[in-house]
Amino acid sequence: MNGGLGEWAPPPQVSGEAEEGWVPRDGGERSGGEWGARNVLGGPLMPCSFDPLTGWLRDGSCNTDARDVGLHTVCAVMTAAFLAFSKSRGNDLVTPRPQWGFPGLKPDDRWCLCAARWQEAFEAGCAPRVVLAATHAAALSVCRLEDLKAHAIDLA
């Protein structure tokens, strides 16, 4: 489905129950019927965006599972510069794809990016701002916390 650095693809078909043997990447415990996903600061994972609806599971959060080979875990605030950068790398996030329910993104939209795409943009000097409380802890397997903090909109 999505083996690249974040090319947009329709979400996986997900039932209301976790698949047999499915474990969240951060090893969260089930509590109150929800997985205890954590953000990069160690707190509970907060929503990223419901409009447009984002997330690997299209649940508004940057949660992940074993099928998410792109690791869509960084809650980023889109900028024109980043959207142009992404398109130049073959990932057009601007053009609507109604057949997949994708509205196309514009500056100031929040979106769960692939951690490797954010890191690539960081290294190119055009990384978008991030929402740390909504960025999944699994992003730390690709991105440095110090770099994410330097681009955070939710640190005082």
Where are these regions (language model features)?
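Glycine- and charge-enriched low-complexity intrinsically disordered segments
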Residues: 137-156
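Extended boundary segments
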Residues: 6, 17-81, 152-154
